[in-house]
Amino acid sequence: MPRLLTKRGCWITLAAAPFLLFLAAWGADKLWPLPLHEVNPARVVVAQDGTPLWRFADADGIWRYPVTIEDVSPRYLEALINYEDRWFWKHPGGNPFSVARAAWQDLTSGRVISGGSTLTMQVARLLDPHPKTFGGKIRQLWRALQLEWHLSKREILTLYLNRAPFGGTLQGIGAASWAYLGKSPANLSYSEAAMLAVLPQAPSRLRPDRWPERAEAARNKVLERMAVQGVWSREQVKESREEPIWLAPRQMPQLAPLFSRMMLGKSKSDKIVTTLDAGLQRRLEELAQNWKGRLPPRSSLAMIVVDHTDMRVRGWVGSVDLNDDSRFGHVDMVNAIRSPGSVLKPFVYGLALDEGLIHPASLLQDVPRRTGDYRPGNFDSGFHGPISMSEALVRSLNLPAVQVLEAYGPKRFAAKLRNVGLPLYLPNGAAPNLSLILGGAGAKLEDMAAAYTAFARHGKAGKLRLQPDDPLLERPLMSSGAAWIIRRIMADEAKPLPDSALPRVAPLAWKTGTSYGYRDAWAIGVNARYVIGIWTGRPDGTPVVGQFGFASAVPLLNQVNNILLSRSANLPEDPRPNSVTRGVICWPGGQSLPEGDGNCRRRLATWLLDGSQPPTLLLPEQEGINGIRFPIWLDENGKRVAADCPQARQEMINVWPLPLEPWLPASERRAVRLPPASTICPPYGHDAQLPLQLTGVRDGAIIKRLPGAAEATLPLQSSGGAGERWWFLNGEPLTERGRNVTLHLTDKGDYQLLVMDDVGQIATVKFVMQ
């Protein structure tokens, strides 16, 4: 009986043993879980093709380049598995035959020759380092079993690919391939695959950059085994043995540092894949370094390149030199808020085209103006009188742009830009005003480049794509026709050529901007495929006298454009939209008139949007007699008379807006254009027949303040002439409209006073204030 019980107990014990082992293993697994995530984070930012841009090592200075199995050459996987662990895909974590072989070798030699570790066991040791003792080997085997229970073979292999040591601060095949060979691990040759497969066995002793002879011998050993096992042919192995151990110049990735720093905050991934083109980025950074010597002291630059066909950012240079503290090299000026100067002007003209306010040949007024305390002027400090919209844009004149913005509405303009991703930054509490169009608000270069894509994307502004998986998002800014017209004007092709003469591929269209005080110089260009954004200036905001958009930013823009064109093929065409047609309009009215019509003082060919011919845009104060359609009353002899004269008949004549009179040839001024006045029933009273004269100060007079006076008071009178008076002091309009004016002068210097009447007669006087 006791014997029977003993037998039964043995059978029960044997039957329960697997269950007990399972419970023990399960408990141990819970008590000592795998440290899968216990690693200091090391991150890398890469270009779209996988080229490393910038590495961010972990706290221990370790650099990793995360890869998947698909990212690695099959040659490397063949060499690794067949040299290190032929039975990797079949064993449960440890290979008993390998362990037995290693134990026999160690015993017979009296020293450790082989550890018999499988790839899984090597991963186990990487995750949980342990001493090379018998107990350590048991612990390693236990961790290997845990790996096999929790992970698939592919996951275990991926861990090895990313955690294996390759010498120095390099971990993983990705980091090793880029650091030693300057190439992706997907493109390894047989020789390179063999060398990197054996390197983790003794990374310090076999480092190819320090011990190329040792690395070559170890590589050849791997190659020979691949031939013996029939994995690679003898011919392949022979050719590979003849290859020298070639290494790329060992240099950690150093491209797009400020962009890479920004991307760390936009992605949690250890490997952040971006849309940058590594080759282009390298060219841009070389250009920046070469340009550094041309910049004034403490100045920097910024460049951004956007492929407007898919909105991917292809190049980003945030400063001229990251390591130059005197130039604030650590400040990324691509996303800094700066005054854009005149760079916004194309947008207001395009929006005004869609609104039906203007067409490209619309007559605008480049004349002195004052709106409250705001007195805009031009960059060259002069005024040009009558000018077309297209010429005003090409010459970047300020007063015409202010005139159009006033008609469109500054608040509406700012809201339109904000809606497509171009916010304008105003001082706290400030509302959008007319100064917006001249740089009176801040903007970012990256946002400006994104908005300029509207001129190449049929009027739709896209959102910049920084990573390949970012969705393509866009919003309408203006019509396709308006975008096409403005782009052609910026390319200096405003003339409406026949379709056969239009270039199929759009030339470079560009616009400059210079902020107040020469603090910022901008240039934005749009070519057939790319939008290029350029900024130069001092990051601290101090002025750089003489540095303006055309002189400082345009040469750099042209250099970048040449680089892009040398790399581009099959550029997209830019056909004329059906909404854009050719037309001929007349000045000063702005619309078509028949041949021979006396109201057509000048004919201009132009592009028209949807066939629209809006009349000339007037300033808010230009109504009635001060506008273009001028009413006159004629007697039976064709002479001008007052409206209430007997038998007076009314006619309408097109005249130029009064503020343009000083810039018109004599034959176009009202005094010549209007029929002579009747002496019997004069239109403005009898004194209107007298010439316009100025009295109160003689020409060339010297004016001095009375002792103790803060200003000199100068009363002036006009006589003769007709209708209202328009007064200008040094080209700036005065608010008075009467026959007399009193000047209050405080500043010394030369002065010119001009008075004009409603029929265009002019009287002037010059004097000096001392």
Language model features by range: what are they?
Residues 125-129, 162-169, 186, 190-202, ...:
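Glycine-rich, acidic and aromatic/proline-enriched surface loops and short helix-turn segments
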Residues 274-295, 305, 316-319, 324-333, ...:
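A penicillin-recognizing enzyme superfamily signal
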Residues 375-378, 409-452:
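Mid-domain, small-residue-enriched loop/turn segments at the edges of structured enzyme/sensor domains
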Residues 108-132, 186, 249-265, 358-413, ...:
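Conserved catalytic neighborhood of penicillin-recognizing serine enzymes
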